[in-house]
Every structure is written in structure tokens, then in C-alpha cells.
Amino acid sequence: MKITKSLLFTLLLAGTAFVSTGCSKNNNTVTIYTSTEDYNIALMKKCLGEQFPNYKIVIEEKSTSEIAAQVIEEGSSSACDIVFAEEYGYLEKMIGQGVLDSIKGDYDLSRYLDDTVPASVNEYVLPNIRCGGGIIINKKVLEDRGLTKPTSYNDLLDSSYRGLVSMASPKSSGTGYMFLYSLVKAWGETEALSYFDSLTPNVLAYTTSGSGPVNALVNREVAVGFGMISQAVDKINSGNNELEVLFFEEGAPCNLYGNAIVKGKKAKTAVKEVMDYLDSFYTNESNRLYYPEPVLKNTNYNVANFPENIQYADMTGNNLAAKEALLAKWTH
């Protein structure tokens, strides 16, 4: 999802203040690592501040890959208590390294859709967000460059798009990876990797963050971004009428993101209470407001300007082993 901002947001009884990074040794301090978007962080700060006025909640932003690498390296000595909205592939990796606490039996996972609680993660992870991707365009930039709306991935290989495409790096971003994986499923590995070799001259930058492409579109730096539907819709609903979400015949790639407790941290009452709140209230609330692609059963959210009847790409087999094997062949 998004890049490290070197910012720590702390919720205090008296209000919100900036603090420096440090281990959350105080039993009333809960440190959360996340790659989620600014608007979700703002909502989380508000909700947690109201629910837990006597706790100090520290939220540190990092990319999905940075979160996994740091928690794996530090283990139970990590400053992090809760990993929030982490991509499932990286959560699988953390599980394999033994750096997450088991939540088996603590929560009613039957509330969640079956595909969000696969056997590979269901003893450690609470589902949080289903995030689909689309080809996001800036209509003004296209018009200024005399370009029409692309209708296929191959359209983006034309030299007229030189430097006008943005995509997150699959090696650092779950968003970037889901686009790569979806095309591997649609075309086969050789053709998909060859496509990105051909596309790279037209890519302004492979961003560290999954939010990077939409931000570049908003800043009119590019005309086309391989981005998150939810982020584009948030910009549209905030008054940006230049953006539009397109889908190609291969379908919309999709990723799942979840929450987990770092090894040894569940014993802290504050950490467990915050995790309980994320499960009982916050996931539904953030999905209702920003992420209507469902993770909970019996939900039907209506977010303004969010595309309906999305046809998703084939993402079957998207597991840690497949991810590591594919990323070993990514050279950009």
C-alpha cells in the first residue's frame, strides 16, 4: 500500500501529538505498523482515540515489505505490537518465521468470507481489507497530451505513453505485485514478464508505495496508473474530477490485507483490547466508509462512485511460495 513517511502518530488523552520511534514497553502503549492509506489512518486515529482515551496508540507508516522485514528481524523485541492491513503474502512469511502470536480460538472467524481465512493464515490473522486494482487515468493529462483512453494493457506499450505510466514495484508493494500476478495468471509467466519489460520505458517510476501511482495522477505527473480502486475513489469523492477507473478484459487484480499481533505482545492487555476492537468494530467501519469490497459476510456497502459489479482477475494460487518464485524473476 504506501511508503514510509517517517511519521509517528500518537493518540493522547489531550489530543494528537508527534512522538519519536521507540519500543512500546509501557503497558498502556500500543504500537501499530501499517501500510494503509492516509484517510484510513485518520479514521483509525479518531476511533482508537475515542475508544481508548487512556492508551497511547502509536501508528508508524511503512511499506508492506518493510513491515515484514523489520518484524522478522526483530521478532518479539520489535517496537511493533500490531501489524495492521498487511498483505497476506507477507503475513504468511511472518508466520513461517514464527514472529506472530497465535489468535486461534480468540475470534469468530466464521463472520468472515471463506476466502479471507485460508488455512495458511487463519490461526494468526484477522481479515481487514479486500483491495481491488484498476487502471486509473487522469483525463486532463490524456487530453493535454492528445491521447485517448487506453482500452487494453497493450495500448500502454505505445511510445506516446513514454514517461506517463506509474506502477508500484512488485518487490516492495502488494499493490504492484497483484498486477504482476494477475497477468501471469491471464497470460502465463513468460508473456507477463515480457510485457513489463516492454512497458518499463513508459513507466515514469516503479514506486515503493502502492499509493504512489494515484498520487502521481493527482499531481498530473502521469496519465495512467496501476492503482487501488479505493484510493482513486477517495480522491474522486474529495473533489478530483480528473480521475477515472478503467478495467481491462483480464479483470481487476485483487489483494487481501489483514491484522496480526507480534510474537509475545498478546499478553499485554492494551494490545489485546485494541485487536478485539479492530475485529468487533473497526474493520466493518472502515469497509463501510472506504473499502466496500467485502471481507465480512452479510455486508453490502455503498460507497459513492465506487465501481459496481467488478469482474476480478483470476488470483488463485497467490501464496507465499508463488510470490517469492515470481519476484525472483522481476528485474525492474
Q: Could you describe each region identified by the protein language model?
A:
Residues 1-30:
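Short, low-complexity disordered leader/linker segments with a strong preference
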Residues 131, 161-168, 195-200, 206-207, 240-263, 277-300:
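Periplasmic-binding protein-like
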Residues 35-42, 79-80, 85-221:
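Extracytoplasmic ligand-binding site segments that recognize negatively charged/polar headgroups
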